[in-house]
């Protein structure tokens, strides 16, 4: 099989690429190394690598010829940078996604798996969060990513392109970003401890997140290439377990001092995924426990 991975040099994308290469597949990677979060990039030299921008349709379109499956992860993928530069967020996450879908349609790609976000649920929905709940977008990031969701559904309904959308819940694991003020909290805490600094906790630290290991996310993406139903639909990819930030800090560095910093606008208070739909239709479920992973580091 031949796969194309947008954002394939980033955190989640590079883990998917490595899995595909290990399984002997042909892989095309598109990534322009765009990041407002000091992210590192990982290019697998066994893939066909292109430092292209998904906003440039004429540049990326020829690469879709002969591709069977597309994993679309290229994005402005952080809340705070999207708030600071909403135009870029819309250009990348909406126009870029439309370009990927149109190129996939033109070249008769079998399936597009789109990576979206649990930020779509906002503040108003009670936990556990279900795919059927209304969107409550609080920032340009969630608005632009959910616009991508609607594009995927439209391309399925109108053009017959098979798409599957994932709403990820706080992905962590190998290659997670650890640098910059917007680094995800697990990587940030680990970096702060390794540097001998206190862990910085936003607000009171009682806000919760559903932390999902990147290996489980990779498995979900692979499962989406094999399912027979669920096209044009959304699936939560999480664990169904919520952990607050103070609990997380204690897991990473028991007894260590934390430094509370002001809350940031546009962020959810509590997240916890209902993953029953993914279990039923994708035959997927998470395997990696957060505390086990931390203790095994």
Per-range role (PLM):
Residues 289-297:
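Amphipathic terminal alpha-helices
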Residues 73, 192-193, 224, 251:
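Conserved catalytic core of Hanks-type protein kinase domains
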Residues 1-169, 215, 284:
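N-terminal Rossmann-like NAD(P)+-binding domain of SDR-like oxidoreductases, especially those catalyzing
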Residues 146, 171-187, 195-197, 202, ...:
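Glycine/proline-rich active-site loop of Rossmann-fold NAD(P)-dependent oxidoreductases
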Residues 147, 151, 155, 185, ...:
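Hydrophobic alpha-helix immediately C-terminal to the catalytic Tyr-X-X-X-Lys motif of short-chain
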Residues 204-206, 234-235, 243-249, 254-275:
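C-terminal "lid/loop" region of Rossmann-like NAD(P)-dependent oxidoreductases
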């Amino acid at each position: 099989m031949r796969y194309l991975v947008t954002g394939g040099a980033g955190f989640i994308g590079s883990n998917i690429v490595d899995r595909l290469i290990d399984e002997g597949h042909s892989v095309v990677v598109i990534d322009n190394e765009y990041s407002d979060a000091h992210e590192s990039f990982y290019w697998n030299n066994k893939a066909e690598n292109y430092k292209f921008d998904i906003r440039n349709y004429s540049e990326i379109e020829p690469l879709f010829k002969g591709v069977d499956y597309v994993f679309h992860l290229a994005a402005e993928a952080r809340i705070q940078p999207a708030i600071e530069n909403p135009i870029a967020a819309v250009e990348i996450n909406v126009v870029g996604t439309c370009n990927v879908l149109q190129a996939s349609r033109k070249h008769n790609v079998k399936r597009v798996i789109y990576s979206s976000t649990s930020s779509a649920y906002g503040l108003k929905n009670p936990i556990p969060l279900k795919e059927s709940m209304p969107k409550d977008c609080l920032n340009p990031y969630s608005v632009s990513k959910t616009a991508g969701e609607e594009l995927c559904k439209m391309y399925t309904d109108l053009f017959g392109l098979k798409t599957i959308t994932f709403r990820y819940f706080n992905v962590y694991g190998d290659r997670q970003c650890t640098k910059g003020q917007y680094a995800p909290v697990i990587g940030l805490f680990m970096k702060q401890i390794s540097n001998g600094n206190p862990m910085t906790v936003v607000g009171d630290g009682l806000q919760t997140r559903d932390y999902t290991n990147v290996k489980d996310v990779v498995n979900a993406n692979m499962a989406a290439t094999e399912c027979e139903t669920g096209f044009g639909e959304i699936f939560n990819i999480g664990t169904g377990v919520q952990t607050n930030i103070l609990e997380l800090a204690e897991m990473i560095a028991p007894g260590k001092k934390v430094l509370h910093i002001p809350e940031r606008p546009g962020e959810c208070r509590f997240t916890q995924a209902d993953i029953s739909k993914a279990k039923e239709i994708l035959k997927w479920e998470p395997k990696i426990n957060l505390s086990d992973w931390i203790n095994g580091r």
